[in-house]
């Protein structure tokens, strides 16, 4: 009897000792990464999130911070590489190898973003407060300078009546509280982007070059894009179905919300 009681006590102690961190502990651990992200210090935020995740890989707040910083880096690089591919296509012809490597890298990077979002989605009571329009000196389009378009990109420029908000109106720069439903929204968004990239990777678009040469001679009659990887079409279908699933989860989460706290996407009962 004494031995049985001993093993029961030890088992309970081990079980409780192996439990994950509490919400308060998670928030304290992730606070430096969250604050860096709130200040628009994206690289620093990712480094600090990685430090947290090195200790506890499933910390949802740190995963969410890293997902956002990874997404920003991925989309910025994709924009730069895509612009290079388009300019090259008009200048000397489409570089299929460059286009393929660009799309392949972007899809892999977005897969890592989704992995972080999926981990964050499993957490309980996950939330993140961000004022997106408060991020300053961010070169969103990667042209090497920050102009008024960069500064206003994430601002709310008009009110509910369609009238322009004054520059000093705080409604231009609201702070949103992102929560569980918004993570599903983000996963759906990323999934649709990955599906597009899978379609790009499925085809050889170098037929554009032949069509352009034909047009110079006698006018192009058609452009042929050859399917080179059927598995990518199947992957695109999978991504689309997953995204539809996440969209449905997002809607359910929004409709179930009973609070009204700085919503990114409000339900009919929220502001």
Model-assigned labels for residue ranges:
Residues 66-67:
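Residue-level signature of tetratricopeptide-repeat
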Residues 8-17:
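Bacterial N-terminal signal peptides
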Residues 28-29, 35-37, 43-47, 70-271:
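Short coil/linker segments at helix-helix boundaries
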Residues 1-8:
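Bacterial N-terminal signal peptides that target proteins for export
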């Amino acid at each position: 009897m004494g031995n049985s009681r001993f093993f029961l006590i030890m088992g309970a102690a081990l079980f409780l000792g192996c439990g994950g961190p509490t919400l308060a502990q998670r928030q304290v651990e992730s606070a430096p990464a969250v604050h860096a992200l709130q200040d628009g210090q994206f690289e620093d935020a990712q480094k600090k999130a990685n430090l947290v995740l090195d200790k506890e890989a499933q910390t949802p707040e740190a995963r969410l911070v890293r997902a956002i910083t990874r997404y920003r880096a991925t989309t910025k690089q994709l924009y730069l590489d895509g612009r290079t591919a388009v300019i090259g296509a008009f200048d000397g012809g489409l570089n299929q190898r460059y286009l393929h490597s660009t799309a392949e890298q972007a899809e892999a990077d977005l897969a890592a973003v989704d992995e972080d979002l999926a981990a964050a989605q499993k957490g309980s009571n996950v939330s993140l407060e961000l004022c997106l329009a408060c991020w300053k000196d961010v070169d969103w389009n990667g042209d090497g300078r920050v102009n008024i378009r960069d500064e206003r990109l994430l601002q709310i420029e008009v009110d509910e009546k369609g009238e322009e908000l004054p520059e000093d109106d705080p409604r231009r720069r609201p702070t949103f509280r992102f929560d569980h439903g918004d993570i599903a929204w983000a996963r759906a968004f990323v999934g649709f982007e990955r599906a597009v990239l899978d379609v790009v990777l499925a085809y050889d678009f170098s037929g554009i070059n032949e069509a352009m040469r034909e047009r110079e001679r006698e006018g192009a009659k058609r452009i042929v894009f050859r399917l080179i990887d059927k598995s990518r079409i199947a992957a695109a279908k999978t991504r689309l179905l997953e995204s539809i699933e996440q969209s449905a989860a997002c809607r359910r989460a929004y409709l179930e919300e009973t609070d009204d706290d700085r919503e990114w996407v409000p339900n009919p009962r929220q502001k």
